[in-house]
């Protein structure tokens, strides 16, 4: 079934594209959600009339989402969960749990905005992508720990490891710069 996209849809196309999709996907998702119109001459003409308004609305929504994304950049959320000795969680952290934690941090998002490929089943720190708009997404750090103290210790250890890596890279960069200057002087 051919449809006209009314907004950008990941892995499908941009607004205004006429794409061929499976009939069930069109009937059950795209058409009821008002993300697409059936591709007919009348609907193509209607879309062309409405195109400027739709693009302006999309631009406004994208700008609002970008403003929220700028505020959410670098957001780290702690989730306290029970876990066994090996670090395996009793249960898992799902997209709904992540959405609730981000809401508790003061941002309004829905569960469907959280892109979690698989549920989180072990302790640790994870980067989870939150799609605020089809064109705007931000990565939120989810720190899953047994307690707040354990999370602080893990964060301190990660920061120390990052400092060690930076300290090791800095002399290497200085050596490369020195070699480049000596090569330039020889030439």
Curated annotation (Swiss-Prot):
The keyword Ribosomal protein applies. This is Large ribosomal subunit protein bL9. It comes from the Bacteria. Belongs to the bacterial ribosomal protein bL9 family. One of its GO terms (cellular component) is ribonucleoprotein complex. GO terms for biological process: translation. Binds to the 23S rRNA. InterPro entries: Ribosomal_bL9, Ribosomal_bL9/RNase_H1_N, Ribosomal_bL9_bac/chp, Ribosomal_bL9_C, Ribosomal_bL9_C_sf, Ribosomal_bL9_N, Ribosomal_bL9_N_sf. GO terms for molecular function: rRNA binding; structural constituent of ribosome. Residues 168-187 are annotated as: Disordered. The keyword RNA-binding applies. Transmembrane segments: none annotated. Keywords: Ribonucleoprotein, Ribosomal protein, RNA-binding, rRNA-binding.
């Amino acid at each position: 079934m051919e449809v006209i996209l009314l907004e950008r849809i990941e892995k499908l196309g941009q607004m205004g594209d006429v794409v061929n999709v499976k009939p069930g996907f069109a009937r059950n998702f795209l058409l009821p959600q008002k993300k697409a119109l059936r591709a007919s001459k009348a609907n193509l003409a209607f879309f062309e009339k409405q195109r400027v308004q739709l693009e302006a609305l999309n631009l406004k929504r994208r700008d609002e989402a970008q403003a929220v994304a700028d505020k959410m950049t670098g957001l780290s959320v702690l989730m306290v969960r029970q876990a066994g000795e090996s670090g395996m969680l009793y249960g898992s952290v799902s997209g709904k749990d992540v959405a609730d934690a981000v809401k508790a941090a003061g941002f309004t998002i829905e569960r469907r905005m959280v892109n979690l490929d698989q549920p989180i089943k072990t302790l640790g720190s994870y980067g989870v992508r939150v799609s605020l708009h089809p064109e705007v997404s931000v990565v939120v750090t989810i720190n899953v720990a047994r307690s707040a103290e354990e999370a602080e210790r893990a964060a301190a250890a990660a920061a120390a490891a990052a400092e060690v890596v930076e300290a090791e890279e800095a002399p290497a960069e200085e050596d490369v710069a020195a070699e480049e200057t000596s090569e330039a002087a020889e030439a």
